[in-house]
Amino acid sequence: MDEILVDAAQPEPALRVAEMNAFYGERQVLRDVAFEAQRGSVTAVIGPSGCGKSTLLACLNRTIEDVPGARWRGDVLLRGEETACLSADELRARVGLVMQQPTPFPFSIERNIAYGLRFRGVRNRRRLREAAETYLDMVGLLGEIDGDVRRSALELSGGQQQRLCIARALALEPDVLLLDEPCSALDVASSATVEAAIGELKKCCAVVVVTHNLAQARRIADSVVCMDAGRVVWQGGCAELFEEKRESVLAPLYGSELL
């Protein structure tokens, strides 16, 4: 596999992907995918249904390795470090993934956050409580529950559960946080709170969001990766895509769906 060339004059991206290919049995679903994501930014991955967006996230987090008959290959670097030598658990601590419509663990809000903190070796109960409050506040949830972290996570609304699962992933302090269609099952008000939380997340890591919603991508993203048939067909700044490349890039992908 070709060596990834790095420009020493440029800041090292939080995530660098090159030559990523993925297969389900004999069917190839990703073809030589390459892109970068910077800390302090939100990268939206968009494209028609079935183009490989969710498979891309599964490869980055290696959950694809749990799928019978699936395989992948490619280069994934975190802050310039090759990840091939990392165990699945080590990688997943550094590349957090919140799936579409995630479900919190069926116990207290605090224990949901403590799950990730204990993975990092935090055992002191006071530190667990303080850290849980910090991450819940980061996603705008602490005030909504009046600071009662002992409440059952299953009592929360759909949007609140979504943000709790994001906070749980943040507790591992990942280099990159992957979000798969984070607002697909939420109402307008809940979607707005999740989008606001995403804007805060990029302060502590690179955020990669898969979304079918072009309006949402335009609201939250700093950069965009456009996919079609398993390939990256365009990538660049969000403003450039929606203001200059709308007809040349988006129209062929979305057709009549593009308003």
Name the predicted role of every residue range.
Residues 239-259:
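C-terminal boundary and immediately downstream tail of ABC-type ATPase nucleotide-binding domains
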Residues 75-90:
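ABC ATPase NBD Q-loop/coupling interface
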Residues 80, 126-147:
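Conserved ABC ATPase "signature" region
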Residues 173:
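Conserved catalytic motifs of ABC-family nucleotide-binding domains
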Residues 151-156, 160:
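Conserved ABC ATPase signature
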Residues 177-180:
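Catalytic Walker B motif of ABC-type/P-loop ATPase nucleotide-binding domains
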